Amino acid sequence: MKYQQFVNSFTHPLQHEDHTPLLRLLSVHGKAAKGIADTVGAIDEKRLKNPGHTLPDLWDEIAVRHCACVYALYKTKDYTEAFNQQDKLLSLFYRWFVDQSSWVLPVLYMMLSDLRDLAEQADQTIHAETGKMPSLEICTRTVSKAFSLCATDRQFKGEESRRRGVYHTACLTIKCYFKVGKPNLCKNIIRAVVSDPKTPSVDTAPLPDQVTWHFYIGMLAFLNGEDKKADEELSWALKHCPADAKRNQELILTYLIPLRLLHGRFPSASLLSQHPRLELVFTPFINAIKNGDVEEYDRRLEWAQVRLVGMSVWLVVERAREGCLRSLFKKAWMASDKSTRVPIETFRLALKLHGVDVESDEVECMVANMIYRGYLKGYISHEKKMVVLGKTNPFPKMSTIAR
């Protein structure tokens, strides 16, 4: 595509508020972008100041910045320069965007996605050498600005309001915060969304944005130890996640499976088989809980520690070890003819048989903790070194235990 032809292509969609052609014209991917890089050539500052054509205000420079971006991306392979040009393009776009209605939101989403991709490409070498991500830091601020422009729209109402873009831009901002290691800032975005009565209900957002929003709310609740809320939000996200979105399902299950382990609720083998990476990590823990195999559980905790920490689920999986202890103690109780009085020594020997050799006092502490948490019904006779269990259902189902 020749330069003048490219420039003229903006006139009709801008006049008729048609976002579809703009998606093709302003994408940094695809044949159109590569064609511009091939035919337009380098963009110098002289052309930026005197583009030689007339488009609606600001669009002269927006068009030229896009040419500069794709030239750097495809011709000089200067990813930092490509990112910088895309970031400058968005700064110009925002100045025009504040006077527009929701018709242009798809274009905003695409340009923000492209900006994030370019930031990651620009930071690859720097991050490997220094651990820093300067372009992604800038990207995060630019994306956050887009959220603010959507959330503060007072010019348009209803379907035309830019507030329709709140959830998409909020989720993208949260994703960027996690990328740059600042998840603590996510609460500011969430508070801005939920505290503003003018924010549309999440139910009115496109389903993909709803799923992403519920996922992030659930993940943040998970990280904050709010198990019930996390389970509800992640379960909703999984239920409504498209069947063919396997990667997104895997992200949701990464947090949902550990939560379910706490309640003795296990994913089916067929579900796990669809996600081999999760199957490899979690199947041994599931089997260990079912069998009361504390030694195997501890071995797997050590084996998977680095991966579990990287997934941010280590602490919850470690807590789920209590379910494994419960299964073992229940087996010991059943081997004692389901007596309501079980010596501490019986539980100690059960642990020893599974490779956990501890003193009676420590076993007593374990039992006391399990009684406190609701895994056992009964009390400890310290003088007689005896656990006195309830006559009915001394080992409640894990799914009924309040967490």
UniProtKB/Swiss-Prot annotation:
User: Which InterPro entries does this entry report, sorted A to Z?
Assistant: Csn12-like, PCI_dom, WH-like_DNA-bd_sf
- Ranges where the PCI domain occurs: 211-394
A GO CC term attached to the entry: transcription export complex 2
- Give the GO molecular function terms: double-stranded DNA binding; RNA binding
Source domain of life is: Eukaryota
A Gene Ontology biological process noted in the UniProt record is:
post-transcriptional tethering of RNA polymerase II gene DNA at nuclear periphery
Q: Which cysteines are joined by disulfide bonds?
A: none
Record's family?
Belongs to the CSN12 family.
Protein name as it appears in the record: Protein CSN12 homolog
The gene behind this protein is CSN12
